[in-house]
């Protein structure tokens, strides 16, 4: 089947089954185009919580689909490709976080939403890159265990210097591989350009940026700032949204040191139209979580949503 035929079948099935399709900005363009909602982790968490659909098809990596299930335990959440995982989320382990809690009993565990469900169960609050600083500032605790992204944690620590941070040594491989030198070379080629990066980038890269923010915040900044050219330091999938919002600007994506070339999350690209159709037809690849995990993991998620 060609894409038009796939899309026609997808649209028919989602109407028949009262299903919605959620897609992260890093998904393939054709996946973003069929989605009912496109967003970053925070936006999609809110939409998932408020949805009245019977079925949620989540086009993202696994922890995102798990989050949708945790917030909607009675709904059927389908993940088009179960091989679409997050290497950074897998870097944080349940036993490792428990050990840190024992070593620092006066600390609060703040987990990035990019964690697996079991780690969320031992977290005090969840954050996204968009609301992390606000949530951490709202906490009474003076000591923070931040899991799993050391670079986002370091960025938050610089914004909230009154708190002590214990950082898990995790990272996002595509963002980590984007070097300061690469951005500076692009700046020489485009001297009038602004640089916008994600806080998952390493500290040296973040420090030379004109703007640091979440995926949605980068899209807002890049499409509305006064520069005609913006160097984008995050996953190349957001180019689709950038062009839709403001096609008159020049968006430059740097080459990364990883094997994918640009800042490119190979896992995010594993969800395809044929896989979306397959899970809608067969209702396979359902996210199943034990009720105990859901009951524990929803607490820090709801704390986040209440604050931000």
Curated annotation (Swiss-Prot):
First-tier enzyme category under EC: transferase
Cofactor remark: Binds 1 [4Fe-4S] cluster per subunit.
Provenance organism: Sulfurihydrogenibium sp. (strain YO3AOP1)
Molecular function terms, GO-annotated: 4 iron, 4 sulfur cluster binding; metal ion binding; quinolinate synthetase A activity
Residue numbers binding [4Fe-4S] cluster: 86, 172, 265
Protein name from the UniProt record: Quinolinate synthase
Pathway field: Cofactor biosynthesis; NAD(+) biosynthesis; quinolinate from iminoaspartate: step 1/1
Disulphide linkage map: none
Residues involved in iminosuccinate binding: 24, 41, 112-114, 129, 198-200, 215
Cofactor(s) listed: [4Fe-4S] cluster
Role summary: Catalyzes the condensation of iminoaspartate with dihydroxyacetone phosphate to form quinolinate.
UniProt xrefs under Pfam families: NadA (PF02445)
Gene Ontology, cellular component aspect: cytosol
Gene: nadA
Protein family membership: Belongs to the quinolinate synthase family. Type 2 subfamily.
Transferase listed as a keyword: yes
UniProt keyword annotation of DNA-binding present: no
Catalytic activity, as annotated: iminosuccinate + dihydroxyacetone phosphate = quinolinate + phosphate + 2 H2O + H(+)
